[in-house]
């Protein structure tokens, strides 16, 4: 096979792998008052702590 044939074959193989791998669901972060809830994440406890740390203590 020629070099260009290998390039095309590898491009199609990479595209097929990307299409067949499952896409992760987006995290849902809900902030209400002083509470924050995180759902659809692999580690929701860590993200909840992060959201609480980034949230200002007093409303501006």
UniProtKB/Swiss-Prot annotation:
Record topological domains on the Lumenal side: 1-6
Entry's transmembrane regions: 7-23
Subcellular location: Host endoplasmic reticulum membrane
Keyword flag Transmembrane helix: yes
Intervals, Cytoplasmic compartment: 24-60
Family affiliation: Belongs to the Tymovirales TGBp3 protein family.
GO biological process, one term: transport of virus in host, cell to cell
Organism, as annotated: Indian citrus ringspot virus (isolate Kinnow mandarin/India/K1/1996) (ICRSV)
Function: Plays a role in viral cell-to-cell propagation, by facilitating genome transport to neighboring plant cells through plasmosdesmata. May induce the formation of granular vesicles derived from the Endoplasmic reticulum, which align on actin filaments.
A single Gene Ontology CC term: host cell endoplasmic reticulum membrane
Entry protein name: Movement protein TGBp3
């Amino acid at each position: 096979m020629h070099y260009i044939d290998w390039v095309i074959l590898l491009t199609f193989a990479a595209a097929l792998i990307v299409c067949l791998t499952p896409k992760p669901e987006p995290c849902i972060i809900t902030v209400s008052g002083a509470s924050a809830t995180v759902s659809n994440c692999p580690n929701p406890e860590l993200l909840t702590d992060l959201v609480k740390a980034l949230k200002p203590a007093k409303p501006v």
